[in-house]
Amino acid sequence: MGKKDIRRKEQREKKRIARERVETLFTLAERVFPYSPELANRYVEIALSVQQKAKIRMPRKWKRRYCKKCHSFLVPGVNARVRLRDKPYPHVVITCLNCGNIMRYPYLREKKARRKYASKSTENGNGPDWTS
């Protein structure tokens, strides 16, 4: 093995450790939030700094659980309001009740499911059946 391979392996290991740490910090934030929201917010800040330092992507399930503006851990019904909207496109609106920041996430699950169903049925030779 050359130096590049060793360095690449080390980088991969560092990123794996960083991913584990981010996951651990967010699960800790989730567990500790009912007792100490400030500590949960601190865990989120640490997780964000680890993620930025290691240059890894934040998993989607955690990306939507903190406010992008004030970096507080969001719990629907406690410090976040979650609403579903259809116009101009179907999306989820999450409002941080600490700072008032609004985040919008599109949801296209039904269309993707229909597309998958249509592609599977055309492979079988049946064609799309939208009657059911």
From Swiss-Prot:
Keywords: Cytoplasm, Endonuclease, Hydrolase, Metal-binding, Nuclease, tRNA processing, Zinc
Subcellular location: Cytoplasm
Classification via Gene3D superfamilies: 6.20.50.20, Immunoglobulin FC, subunit C (1.20.5.420)
GO terms, molecular function: ribonuclease P activity; zinc ion binding
Any single Gene Ontology cellular-component annotation: cytoplasm
EC class name: hydrolase
Keyword Cytoplasm applies: yes
Cofactor note: Binds 1 zinc ion per subunit.
Disulfide bond residue pairs: none
Tagged with keyword Transmembrane helix: no
Function: Part of ribonuclease P, a protein complex that generates mature tRNA molecules by cleaving their 5'-ends.
Subunit structure: Consists of a catalytic RNA component and at least 4-5 protein subunits.
Family: Belongs to the eukaryotic/archaeal RNase P protein component 4 family.
Protein name per the record: Ribonuclease P protein component 4
